[in-house]
Amino acid sequence: MDSIEEADTSHPQLLHRYLSQNDVEHLYRIFNKRKQLLPEELRTELTDLTGVEFQDEEFQTLFMKINANKDEYCQWDELVSYLILGFQNDDPLAVQESLDLPISQDMGMKLGRQTYPVTKIQYAPLVSYDGTVNWSQGFWVTSTREAVINFWKRDWKHLKTGKAFSVDLKRIKTMVLDTAILPDQNYFCVACLECELRFYDIIASGFTLKTIINRIPNAINSLYYHFSPDTRSKMILGDYVGHVRMIEFFPENKEPFKFDAATAITRMAFCDLVGGLCPQMTCVDYGRLLPDIVRQVEFIESRNSFVACSENDPLVPHHMRNKLQVSLVIQHTRKLDRRTKFKVFKGVTCFAFDSIKDFLVTGGPDGQLRLWDSRRSDKPTEILAGHNSAVVFMFLQDESLKLYSMDQKKIVKIWDVPNRTLIQTYSQFSSSMFKTVPACAYYSELNRELVVGANKVLSVSCCPKIALEVTDGESHTQPISVLLHNPLFKVIVSCGLDSFIIVWDYTGNRKLTIIQDAHTEVIHGILEKVQITAACFDPKLQLMVTGARNGELKIWNFNSGSLMSCMSIGSECEVTAVFWERTGILAMGWNHVIVEFPVGSTGIDFPSGVEWQKLHSDDILCASINRTEPKALASCSYSGEIILWMLETGQAYKRFDAAKPRQKIPVNFKKKRIPQPTRRQTRLSIFQPQEHWRQRRLTRIVMPATAELLRQLTIHNLLFLEARPFHPDYGTLLASLDTGRILVFSHHPDGGYMGAFSAVHMAGDRVIMMTTDSDNRFLFTGTYLGYIKIWLLENYFVPSGKQPKVNRAALRLQFPFLMDDVVPGRAKRSVANQPMPMLLSSYQAHRTCVTDLVYMHASQLLVSASSDRTIRIWTISGRYVGLLGSPVKWPTLDPDHPIARNYNFRIPPDLHREVSFTTAQVLRGGERFIKFKSRILQEASERRRTEAIETYGKPLEPPYLNTATFPYGPHTSYHPDPKLDFSFRQTPIFEHLSIPNLLKMKPVDSEKVLRDAKQLNFSNDGDRIDSYHEKKDNIFK
């Protein structure tokens, strides 16, 4: 625990960075002597040890973080827990931790049902003449036992089909055991049951047999080809009895299979190849290294060694089967004495090796995975059990942090290697393929994709990388439902429908705490996640309560992720709003009633809930609380009724109807049974946008006022303006309707409905979330279509004598939306006849619904959450700062000061090309686009340019010259440049040249031409030209 780096005095709450091991031991002795310390005593000890002078507010915040028991003393366990959490927060892997499962996307089908089952899948990169390898360009190859080889493009479109039949067998069909691609030589190798190797030329569209290596002692079962521009290409061979051999191809002679004009197929015996009679290649026989069929071979270039594995010999006598046999060998290619042997019970069927970390993983027929240190072969470091059948394929990912293994039943398991735990079990392959057909697999490191073939070829993405040119990533795995800001700890807490609770350090884009599966329930014996729908902090901002869709409430210490208490408002009653007051917790939802859980004697224990008077006739959808005196609570139901409650007594004193806001509705204080109306239609989630809204461009449609009043209106959000006085002339309560309008009420007993304004500019859009600053100067609204709008509220529904003056010039400098435009956008046109409240900004922040908004007054930052699973940070003017959880980093933000104007702002990649002009202007900070010509002016310019080029309105037609005036011969046609085919090793140039036929030349009498030239007289040409100009001048005179 020694301090590695110097203490940063700008963050005095990070004690783990200041205290050394000696300091912690000194504190332990003090706590061991005194048992507990008072705040002042702890402050004195920390000041003496660290030398940091704590301010009163800073130390009070620090003590509240340490004091988990919420008493007046600090215990040793509390201090150690706080230091441990600090070290966990500094873990660099906390940012890289993914919330998604390794295989979270849908499975894709590359090829449908095949005639012959696929036994091997390979990918060949493009190798240029200079030896450079381009993995982004290449082709796929699928092999079958029936010797049918199919070649596919990179997008799995068919290229060609080759048949690797034997030229010697007439009636008996061949059986292919293994195949290998030689991409640097454009050859394809086939190992068959006839104990021979066949090499096919696969240049262009051909599949021609060129060379056969026959008379191999045993059939080859495993092939592996390795090529490099700097070293010799190598092919590792493993046969049926455990022999391993290596064939080397010389780099100075890239034609090991030279064309022989005498024979179409070159044949060579394997004994001649081993004896060195073939000058193009050499073969090294390492003998019988394994006891049985070689299952897999692989070459390790960094160690100049190869790895081979096999199962145990099944023909061993019964009394010797318990004896361990050599199942895996690491053999140096040059130094034969450098050989490492691994003995595994029942043998090894497949392996994965990381040469950088010397890390080896083996899988056997017993279904167990064994982790080895390749330098120690006596005992595995760990054994992972989980497969019920033999493991047939595996690979490592992300620097050996994840291990993927597949068994014979086509079940894929993903393991966390450092923690030795199982992350995920993926069984979709087993249900999509025939169970009796064995499967093969290939992992593409370029696309991070696992391709599995049997009777079909299917693929899944394994931890795919984020395309940063398209998106900044995601913050949650499912839509985000709640977003909270804790000013005490200066963090942001987000809750999602994926049942995740994440604590974010928004200043540095880091995940501090992740609570997975926060709410769960058992359905039909399976543990299922429950969506989180509501959350809030306690008055001291140290604890958090969350509400779920099944009616459950949980109390959390969100810093440590520990659960403290559980409650419920009713079975299968979704919690839509929850508030934590000093007297208790208020929760409401689909139970039609407000439930209060009084605070127990310890301040943490909560007895059973007490229901308030039931006045709502339908499910409660939203609520808002006013914590200024007198405290009040507003709740709204699905039918549009708003009820105002006195928070101290729990009595209702006001009631409104959204469809008829001016009508005075008496509050029913009599306890009577209110029948629940039957729903005529299924409710739609705000997190799932309807498809027909995406398929067409929406326009503003104004419905008649009478038609709007006749229908029941749903209220999506309520908001109290707590900074305004409690007076009937002040608008203190806002309610957003389903029509896109916001109603304004006064929650004073003598007040009521005051007015409304339209807050959207797109048909079908509506305000889902509202928030405001601490002074109620601005109103921030988030809409269903992803727009964020900022309104000036300081002079809206305020008495005329109390309205402050509006400095429009200062607002214009702060909000780029207010700049004058040549053609006003739709957002400005929608409020042209609506002078108040003043629209300060409007821009599209998300592609889908905005589910929550948080405004931080000190830093002037606006944080938005959306159903597109992202949390984005904006400035108050609309500039994009970043996305929480994105791999894109940004400079550390100051939580107490606004962002400087010279900050490197960006535009979200998903909004870069598909937003309106108004949104683009706001995201660019007022910078103008290049003014393009309109379509009419552009077409007129093209028309004038066309007229200048063409003649008489159409292009010239041949012949371009008058043959009577210019009696030339026939004009030869245009010959394009030849296109050479460089896919061959030798380019036949003369076959591509277009040579015209030779014509007979007419003989010319050269002597006659010379005589005529001598008779020409040019002496009087100068006088003739002068006389011509004199006549011309006389004419003009």
Curated annotation (Swiss-Prot):
Disulfide bonds: none
The entry's keywords: Repeat, WD repeat
Gene3D superfamilies to which the protein is assigned, alphabetical: YVTN repeat-like/Quinoprotein amine dehydrogenase
Family annotation (PROSITE patterns): WD_REPEATS_1, WD_REPEATS_2, WD_REPEATS_REGION
WD repeat start and end residues: 122-162, 171-210, 343-382, 386-425, 475-514, 527-568, 615-657, 716-755, 762-801, 845-884
Keyword check for Repeat: yes
InterPro entries reported in the protein's UniProt record: WD-EF-hand_domain, WD40/YVTN_repeat-like_dom_sf, WD40_repeat_CS, WD40_repeat_dom_sf, WD40_rpt
SUPFAM superfamilies: DPP6 N-terminal domain-like (SSF82171), WD40 repeat-like (SSF50978)
Domain of life: Eukaryota
Protein name according to UniProt: WD repeat-containing protein on Y chromosome
Name of encoding gene: WDY
